């Protein structure tokens, strides 16, 4: 064994210790996973002569990366809470069927997405805001990245089922394999072999294959509940599970898909109001956001299986305690990071680029974009609780509200109607954080807490 397979007992022991035990390996995993997304950009930005232009071009591929991740999470993050609830109810056979259904849907959708992407890569990039100059770098990167769609989606979509069984350290290791490989392979392919932007994509695909191989090995050979493809005679029974998986996963799917839509809208408006340089600025802001959000995501994912398992086991006191601990951890962390962003933005920006003109334009944009980021925590906490407790309608509604009905309209309204230019694009985010995040969190408190009290009264 590479690692000792220590499991977390979601039903017993300290809730705080359980969340830390689940969240810390996930934090390491997510930090490493972040390398998949930002290491390419760091190295690409330092390619002699073309770094800034190539960075903006690769940033145009970000919506596609988000779409692929969104589909993986639709089936993975949609299935894992149902899997955990079934385990909490001691229905292991049902839990396995849910996992197998998720796995089959992950693989099928990956093949479909890869084929669509390869066929329509150029028009998609133009839709995302690519100019003819940007296509020179964005098109080859996207074509190579698409080849790794299947391993990428397996690694992302099935890792939650490792964590949901209490093997959070194994989940961390599965991400570490690919992330470390990517960190080592990127400079080799980009600079040593001289492949440039293409080299970054090749390194990423190889790394994704390594992660996916480990995830499949563990879930088919070592886990307590093992995964496989659905058999033909199981397809009809799986339709009900598939519907529930998609229903629950739709909230996170919408949240990620609308991230992609917002990115497309921002790039299109910025290309008109600020030119290609502001596409690069937005790429840096997106990278900083990923850097900041990674621990938040880890804390949410660390708390989610504990919420789901104890909700299924009808242990409302532990559900309530998990909500409080998870919320406190996230809010404290974000307060620290928000202070760094507001008072020392240049430090974070220079991680991705040392171009003086790019840094100069990025500093005010970063401050505007993150002005009310702490309110975004309220959205994350509310969404995680709704998803973990199988509250599909609430999760879906609040995913749509902030991005589709607040951010996107403001991204057009503030630059064009209020004549705020590029600042309007970046300020749309904090306005949506305050409105959307506040409404989501208050609704969560008003719906979930009374239900937990009723559960206590019944028991």
Question: What function would you assign to each model-found segment?
Answer:
Residues 1-23, 83-148, 192-249, 307-372, ...:
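Short alpha-helical transmembrane segments in multi-pass integral membrane proteins
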Residues 10-50, 63-78, 82, 107-114, ...:
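N-terminal transmembrane alpha-helices
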Residues 21-40, 144, 178, 207-211, ...:
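Transmembrane helical elements of multi-pass membrane transporters/channels
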Residues 29, 33, 37-44, 69-76, ...:
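Alpha-helical transmembrane segments and their lipid-water interface positions
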Residues 31, 35-56, 125-132, 188-195, ...:
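Helix-terminus/linker motif at the lipid-water interface of multi-pass membrane proteins
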Residues 52-63, 138, 142, 201, ...:
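Small-residue hotspots at the loop-to-helix junctions and early N-terminal turns
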Residues 55-115, 152-171, 267, 279-339, ...:
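Small-residue-rich hydrophobic transmembrane alpha-helices
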Residues 76, 145-163, 171-182, 200-215, ...:
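Short runs within selected transmembrane alpha-helices of multi-pass transporters and secretion channels
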């Amino acid at each position: 064994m590479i690692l000792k397979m220590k499991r977390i007992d979601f039903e017993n022991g300290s809730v705080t210790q359980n969340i830390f035990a689940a969240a810390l390996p996930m934090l390491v995993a997510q930090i490493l996973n972040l390398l998949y997304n930002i290491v390419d950009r760091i190295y690409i930005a330092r390619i002699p002569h073309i770094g800034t232009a190539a960075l903006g071009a690769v940033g145009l591929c970000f919506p596609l990366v988000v779409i692929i991740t969104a589909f993986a999470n639709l089936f993975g993050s949609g299935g894992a809470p149902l899997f955990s609830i079934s385990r909490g109810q001691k229905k292991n056979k049902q839990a396995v069927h849910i996992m197998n259904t998720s796995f089959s849907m992950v693989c099928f959708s990956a093949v479909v997405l890869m084929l669509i992407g390869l066929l329509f890569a150029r028009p998609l990039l133009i839709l995302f805001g690519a100019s003819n100059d940007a296509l020179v770098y964005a098109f080859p990167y996207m074509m190579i990245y698409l080849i790794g769609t299947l391993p990428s989606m397996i690694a992302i979509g099935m890792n939650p089922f490792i964590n949901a069984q209490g093997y959070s350290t194994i989940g961390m290791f599965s991400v570490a394999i690919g992330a470390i490989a990517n960190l080592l392979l990127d400079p080799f392919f980009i600079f040593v072999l001289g492949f440039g932007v293409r080299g970054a994509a090749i390194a990423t695909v190889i790394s994704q294959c390594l992660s996916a191989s480990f995830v499949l090995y563990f879930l088919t050979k070592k886990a307590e509940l093992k995964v496989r493809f659905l058999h033909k005679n199981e397809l009809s029974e799986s339709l009900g599970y598939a519907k529930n998986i998609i229903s629950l996963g739709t909230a996170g799917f919408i949240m990620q898909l609308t991230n992609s839509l917002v990115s497309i809208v921002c790039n299109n408006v910025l290309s008109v109001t600020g030119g290609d340089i502001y596409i690069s600025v937005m790429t840096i802001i997106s990278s900083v956001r990923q850097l900041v959000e990674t621990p938040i995501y880890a804390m949410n994912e660390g708390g989610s299986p504990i919420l789901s398992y104890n909700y299924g086991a009808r242990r409302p006191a532990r559900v309530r305690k998990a909500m409080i601990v998870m919320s406190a951890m996230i809010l404290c962390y974000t307060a620290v990071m928000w202070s760094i962003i507001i008072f020392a933005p240049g430090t974070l920006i220079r991680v991705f680029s040392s171009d003086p003109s790019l840094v100069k334009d990025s500093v005010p944009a970063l401050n505007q974009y993150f002005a009310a980021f702490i309110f975004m925590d309220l959205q994350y906490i509310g969404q995680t609780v709704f998803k973990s407790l199988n509250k599909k309608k609430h999760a879906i509604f609040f995913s749509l509200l902030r991005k589709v009905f607040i951010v996107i309209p403001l991204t057009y309204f503030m630059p064009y109607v209020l004549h705020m230019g590029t600042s309007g694009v970046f300020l749309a985010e904090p306005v949506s954080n305050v409105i959307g995040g506040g409404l989501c969190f208050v609704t969560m408190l008003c719906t979930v807490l009374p239900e937990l009290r009723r559960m206590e009264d019944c028991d």
